């Protein structure tokens, strides 16, 4: 990336696949150095304009499965669809893959018959289900909670089968009620993304297109979803992606969409202002709820929109996660006067 910046004399260069966070950090750091060197805001804006050449996409592309969103869930869906024999196209509006998973801790809760007994931890799927329901004040859908908890350890095994390595110890993530949180051996959720990217690079039946934003989900006369209309951010051209077997919307949440979160804030935090002073722990450029809104436009039902999670470890103002290397069981929260308030 550094070589490209020097060659093009621009920050508007592509990152390196498999090193998305490092590429983004390097370009940000160079930009900060330019600011310190008194480069004007206007010149800096010009330096950030993209200088890469992009071949225009066809007006229409056909595949079996179209996935909107190249974050953790979208890439996991792409790998699973590929393993099932489908041809897949993933559409990602940013110039890098990973979305909010890239900036997560990567915790995955699962009752583990291998790791937990070695640590003297008693657990079961039934206990996981019970604690998940109680942790949600018993407003969760029991069938979905059961599906989540029963599928949690198989998800760990599946991730391991494609190359993810987990630590031998399990912890207690923030908000968890039991010591069953699995963490990648290499810290952060970016570990998952690197494995997904490696798998996709080795399987030509999965095509990833970045810098392209889905604008509309399309239906036929019978109401069946048949494709996606998307606009390439760099060329400004539209492409119709026809999906023979279906479209998966995996665009994540809406934590960075201040207007939307204020509109739906009718739940436990309705007495509080979730305006701009509250940051977003997710990757802000992607956490806009675009997939939810597109789904609603074609008749999809939505549930739980008011069930907004407020995280205690976000940096005030920005919401970026603070790297607090302690268990959720042993933190003490104090205010600026040193008084405990939790």
What would you call each of these model-derived segments?
Residues 234-237, 242-314:
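Glycine-rich loop(s) and the adjacent beta-strand/alpha-helix scaffold that form part
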Residues 54-73, 89:
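Beta1/beta-strand and adjacent pyrophosphate-binding region of the FAD-binding site
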Residues 83-103:
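Glycine-rich FAD pyrophosphate-binding loop
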Residues 1-49:
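Active-site- and interface-proximal helix/loop "cap" or "latch" segments in soluble metabolic
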Residues 45-62, 338:
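A short, basic/flexible loop-to-alpha-helix module at the beginning of a structural domain
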Residues 96, 102-207, 211-216, 261-263, ...:
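Conserved N-terminal/central alpha/beta ligand/cofactor-binding core
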Residues 187-245, 292, 298:
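Helical element adjacent to the flavin cofactor pocket in flavoenzyme catalytic cores
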Residues 308-342:
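FAD cofactor-binding and catalytic pocket of flavoenzymes
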